[in-house]
C-alpha cells in the first residue's frame, strides 16, 4: 500500500516545482523502486514457510536471499546523493531512469525464478503444492513490470503486484478448504473433488489403499488430544514422504 501511494505521488508531482518537491520525489521513487525488489524477496520467504513450515529453513533462506536485497538497498542509499545510478531528478523535478536500473529488474526476475524453482522442487520431493499459487502471483507481476520497462511513462508494476496478491488470496482460500488442518494432508472434500475430476478426464484404472491407525482413540484417552494431534501430524508427514509422485495421500477422518 505504501509503495502504491508513493508511486502515485511520484507521478502526480513529476515536473511540478514547489517547496520540498525534490526531497519528496526522491523519497517516493526510492520507496516504490526499492520495495519492488523487497516484494520478490518476501514472496520467496512466504513460499518457503508455506511449503515447509520450518523456521530454521526460513532463516537460512532469508539469509541467502538477503544478499541481493542488501546490495540493492546499499545502492539505493548511494543513489540518494544525486549520482543517478538508479534514477535521477532533474532541476525541473522530472524523473529519469539511471544506468543501473536494469539491475533492479534482473534482481526481481531472479527472485521470481527462484520461487518457481523452489515450488517445483518441493513438488518433486513429494510436498503438496498442487494448489499453491506461484504462477498466479509471478505471471501478473512479470507482465506489469515488463510493460513498465518497455513503455516508459506508464505505471503498471505495482498495480500488477496488487492483482497478483488478489489471485494468491483466492487460490489460498481454495487450497485451505482442501487441506486437513492437523495432518496437512488433503481432506475428504478434496477427495470428492479429485474423484469427480478423475472420472471426467482419466480413463486409466484408479486404485486406493485405506489405512486405519490402531488404538488411536486410546492415544487420546491416555495421553490427551495434544499427543493425539502430534501422532496425526507424524502420520501425515510419513505418508507424504512415502507415496509415489502419481499418488495423493488424504485424511478421510471417520468414515
Where are these regions (language model features)?
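Conserved long alpha-helical elements within nucleotide-processing catalytic cores of c-di-GMP signaling
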Residues: 187-207, 217-244, 250-254
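Membrane-interface helix termini and inter-helical loops of multi-pass transporters
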Residues: 16-19, 85-93
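Hydrophobic alpha-helical transmembrane segments of multi-pass membrane proteins
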Residues: 1-45, 65-82, 134-149
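Hydrophobic cores of alpha-helical transmembrane segments in multi-pass inner/ER membrane proteins
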Residues: 33-45, 106-115, 164-167
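Short aromatic-rich membrane-water interface segments that cap or initiate transmembrane helices
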Residues: 24-34, 93-104
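Membrane-interfacial segments
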Residues: 48-55, 86, 123-126, 151
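Alpha-helical transmembrane segments of multi-pass integral membrane proteins
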Residues: 1-6, 59-71, 95-149
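Signal-transducing coiled-coil linker helices
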Residues: 118-120, 124-182, 188-199
Amino acid at each position: 500500500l505504501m509503495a502504491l501511494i508513493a508511486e502515485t505521488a511520484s507521478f502526480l508531482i513529476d515536473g511540478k516545482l514547489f517547496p520540498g518537491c525534490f526531497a519528496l520525489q526522491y523519497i517516493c521513487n526510492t520507496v516504490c523502486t526499492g520495495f519492488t525488489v523487497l516484494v520478490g524477496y518476501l514472496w520467496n520467504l512466504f513460499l518457503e514457510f508455506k511449503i515447509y513450515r520450518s523456521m530454521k529453513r526460513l532463516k537460512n533462506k532469508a539469509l541467502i536471499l538477503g544478499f541481493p536485497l542488501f546490495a540493492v538497498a546499499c545502492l539505493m542509499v548511494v543513489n540518494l546523493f544525486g549520482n543517478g545510478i538508479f534514477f535521477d531528478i532533474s532541476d525541473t523535478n522530472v524523473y529519469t531512469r539511471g544506468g543501473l536500473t536494469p539491475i533492479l529488474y534482473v534482481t526481481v526476475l531472479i527472485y521470481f525464478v527462484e520461487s518457481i524453482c523452489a515450488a517445483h522442487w518441493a513438488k518433486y520431493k513429494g510436498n503438496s503444492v498442487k494448489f499453491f499459487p506461484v504462477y498466479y502471483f509471478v505471471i501478473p507481476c512479470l507482465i506489469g513490470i515488463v510493460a513498465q520497462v518497455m513503455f516508459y511513462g506508464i505505471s503498471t508494476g505495482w498495480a500488477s503486484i496488487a492483482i497478483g496478491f488478489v489471485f494468491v488470496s483466492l487460490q489460498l482460500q481454495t487450497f485451505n478448504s482442501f487441506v486437513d488442518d492437523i495432518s496437512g494432508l488433503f481432506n475428504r472434500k478434496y477427495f470428492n473433488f479429485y474423484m469427480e475430476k478423475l472420472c471426467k478426464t482419466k480413463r486409466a484404472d484408479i486404485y486406493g489403499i485405506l489405512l486405519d491407525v490402531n488404538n488411536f482413540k486410546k492415544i487420546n484417552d491416555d495421553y490427551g488430544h495434544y499427543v493425539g494431534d502430534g501422532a496425526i501430524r507424524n502420520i501425515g508427514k510419513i505418508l507424504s514422504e512415502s507415496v509415489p509422485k502419481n499418488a495423493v495421500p488424504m485424511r478421510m477422518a471417520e468414515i
